[in-house]
Amino acid sequence: MAADSREEKDGELNVLDDILTEVPEQDDELYNPESEQDKNEKKGSKRKSDRMESTDTKRQKPSVHSRQLVSKPLSSSVSNNKRIVSTKGKSATEYKNEEYQRSERNKRLDADRKIRLSSSASREPYKNQPEKTCVRKRDPERRAKSPTPDGSERIGLEVDRRASRSSQSSKEEVNSEEYGSDHETGSSGSSDEQGNNTENEEEGVEEDVEEDEEVEEDAEEDEEVDEDGEEEEEEEEEEEEEEEEEEEEYEQDERDQKEEGNDYDTRSEASDSGSESVSFTDGSVRSGSGTDGSDEKKKERKRARGISPIVFDRSGSSASESYAGSEKKHEKLSSSVRAVRKDQTSKLKYVLQDARFFLIKSNNHENVSLAKAKGVWSTLPVNEKKLNLAFRSARSVILIFSVRESGKFQGFARLSSESHHGGSPIHWVLPAGMSAKMLGGVFKIDWICRRELPFTKSAHLTNPWNEHKPVKIGRDGQEIELECGTQLCLLFPPDESIDLYQVIHKMRHKRRMHSQPRSRGRPSRREPVRDVGRRRPEDYDIHNSRKKPRIDYPPEFHQRPGYLKDPRYQEVDRRFSGVRRDVFLNGSYNDYVREFHNMGPPPPWQGMPPYPGMEQPPHHPYYQHHAPPPQAHPPYSGHHPVPHEARYRDKRVHDYDMRVDDFLRRTQAVVSGRRSRPRERDRERERDRPRDNRRDRERDRGRDRERERERLCDRDRDRGERGRYRR
C-alpha cells in the first residue's frame, strides 16, 4: 500500500512537470538529438519495462531544463530524480535501505548540479558579452548581410553545454540501467533461490557503493573540466579581443590606403562578410561530448578566428596578383612618361640657358587667349624698346604672362622676332581710356607652356632685381633675374602639346644669322623668318629697294687670289640718284621734284665696254638718253661668259634708275603743262583786254557826257523857276 501511494504521488508530480515543461521539452528535443537516440535505444531494449522508460524520460527533463528552472525547490528536483526500481521479492528493510542510499546519492548529484548551474549562469553573460561587442564593431553592411550571427553563436554555445550535460546524464542512466538490471535479475531469481537473497543484497550494496564512488569521481571530473573550460574560455576571450583589435587596426589601415591612393581595392565586402558568416556557421555547428568538447571548441574557434580579412588576402592570391600586375603596368607606364618628361625638361633647360626673363602683366584673360591663339603680343613703347634691345643681345628672351588679380601665371613664351609695324591690326581688348595707337609694334612669340601656375607654388621665389620681392609682384615689363626666372619656368607643369624642337631650331637659326658679318658697315637688321616666296607689301615698293636681299660676301672675299672684278661694272652709289640725301629721306615730293629738276639732264648713254674681239654696233640717235634694246649675244668666241648674277644685278639697278627717270620726266611734263595752260589763257586775255578797254572807255565817256548835259539842263530849269517865284 505504501508503495502504491508513493507511486501515485510520483505520477502526480510527473504530470505537473509535464504541464510546466511541455513547450520547452519540444524545443529541447529539437536541439538535442541525443535524447531521441537514447529513446530509440530504450525502446529497442526488451529488458526495460514501461515504468523504466517513463522514469528515464522524467530523468531527462529536469537534467535538460535545470538551467532554465534554477529557482525550483529542492524537493521537486529530488522527486524528479528518484529512480523507481521494482520491489518484487524484497523485504521492507531492504527496500528502505536502498531507498535511503538512493536519496543520499540524488542529494549529492543535485548539489553538484546546482554548483555547475550557478557557474554556468555566471559564465553565460560574460560569454555573450564579447560576442555582442564584436557584433557592434562590425560594419552595418556586414550586419545586414549576415543577420543572425548572434543567435547562431548562442545556439552553438547552448548546444555545447547541453552536449556536456547530456553526456553526464547518459553516464548516470547507464549506471542506473546496470543497477536496475541487477535488481531485476535479482528479483526474478528470488522466486527460485530465496536463500541467495542476502548475497544479492550484499552484492547490490557493494554495487551501489561502487556506483556512488563512480558518480562522485564523475562529478569531480566534471568540476575540473568546468574549471579548465572556464580558464580556457577566459583565455579565448582575451585572444578574441586581441584579434578584434588587430582586425580594427587592419581595417583602419585599409581605409587610410584607400583614401590616400586613387587605386581601388579589388577585395569586395562580400568576401569579408562571407568569411565572417563562415566563422559563425562553424561556431553554430560545433558540438562536443565529455572532456573533448572544450578542446574541440578551442580548436574550432581558433580556426574560425583565423579566417579574417588578412587570411582572405592570402587565400585570394589571384586578386592580389592581378592587382600587383596592374601596379607593375602602372609603374611601366609611369617610367615611359617619366622618360618623356625628362627629355622635355632637358630641352626646356636648353631653351632657358642664358636667357632674359620679363614679367608681362595683362589686364584681362582675352588678350592672353588671343596671344596664345595667334602667337603675337603688343606692349607699350617703353617695354617695346626694352624687349628689342634684349632680343638683339640675349640668346633667348622669355616672356612670363600673368593676368592681374588672377592669382596665377598663365604661361610663358619666347620672343621669335623684333617688333614690326604696318602689319594687319590686332584687335586687343583695351581698358577704358586707352587707344590702339598707344601700343607699340607687334612681337611674334613662340609659346613654350600654355598651362597655368598658381602663385602659391612660386611663393619661395624672390626677384633680386625687384628689391627681393616675391616673383609674382612686378609691373608690366619687369625683368626677372636669371636663376629666379629659370626656377619659375621649371615650376610650370609640362605642356606635351608644345614641340620644343621647333623653338630650338629657331634659336639656332637666329644664332647663325647673328654670327654672319655684314658688309659695307651697315647696321644689322633682323627680318622675321618667313616662308620662301612670301613677301610683305612694302618689299614691292620702289623706294624700299635696300630691303631686298643682296649677296653679301665676307671682307676677305675680294682679296683672295684669282679674283678679278668685272671691268664693266663700276660701283656707283645709286641710292639717291643725284638728289641730296636729306631731301631724299625727309623732303616732300615737291622738294624731290624740284631738286631733281635742277640736277640737269642725265649723261648720254654709254654702253659697257666690249670684250676683246667684239665689235660695238653704232648707237641710234634715239637711244642717246635711253638704254638700247637688248642685243643677241654672239656665239662663243673663246672668252669667258659674263656671270649671270653680275648681269642680273647691273641690269636690275640700271632698269630701276631708268624707270625713275622716266617717271620724273612724265610727272614734270604733266606739272609744267598744267601750269602753262592758265598762263597762256591769261596772256590771251591780256592781249584782248586793250581793245575791250578802249571800247569800254569810249562808252563810259559818252555816258558821262550825256549825264553832264542832263545835269546842266536841270540846273537851268531850277534857276528859271526860282526867278519866277521871287518876282
UniProtKB/Swiss-Prot annotation:
Biased composition (Polar residues): 63-90, 280-289
Keyword Nucleus: yes
Cross-link Glycyl lysine isopeptide (Lys-Gly) (interchain with G-Cter in SUMO2): residue positions: K96
Origin superkingdom: Eukaryota
Feature: compositional bias, Low complexity: 315-325
Chain positions recorded as RNA binding sites: K361, S362, N363, W377, S378, W428, D476
Localization per Swiss-Prot or TrEMBL: Nucleus; Nucleus speckle
One GO BP annotation of this record: in utero embryonic development
Annotated phenotype, changing M438A: Reduced binding to N6-methyladenosine (m6A)-containing RNAs
UniProt effect for mutating L387E: Does not affect ability to influence alternative splice site selection
CDD domains on file: YTH
Molecular functions (GO terms): mRNA binding; N6-methyladenosine-containing RNA reader activity; RNA binding
All copies of domain YTH, residue ranges: 355-492
Modified residues (Phosphothreonine): T148
Impact upon substituting W377D: Abolishes RNA-binding and ability to influence alternative splice site selection
One GO CC annotation: plasma membrane
PTM info: Tyrosine phosphorylated.
Domain notes: The YTH domain mediates RNA-binding.
Cited PANTHER family: YTH DOMAIN-CONTAINING PROTEIN 1, YTH YT521-B HOMOLOGY DOMAIN-CONTAINING
Known partners and oligomeric status: Interacts with SRSF1. Interacts with SRSF2. Interacts with SRSF3. Interacts with SRSF7. Interacts with SRSF10. Interacts with CPSF6. Interacts with KHDRBS1/SAM68. Interacts with TRA2B. Interacts with KHDRBS3. Interacts with EMD. Interacts with RBMX. Interacts with ZCCHC8.
Protein known as: YTH domain-containing protein 1
Organism: Homo sapiens (Human)
Lineage: Eukaryota, Metazoa, Chordata, Craniata, Vertebrata
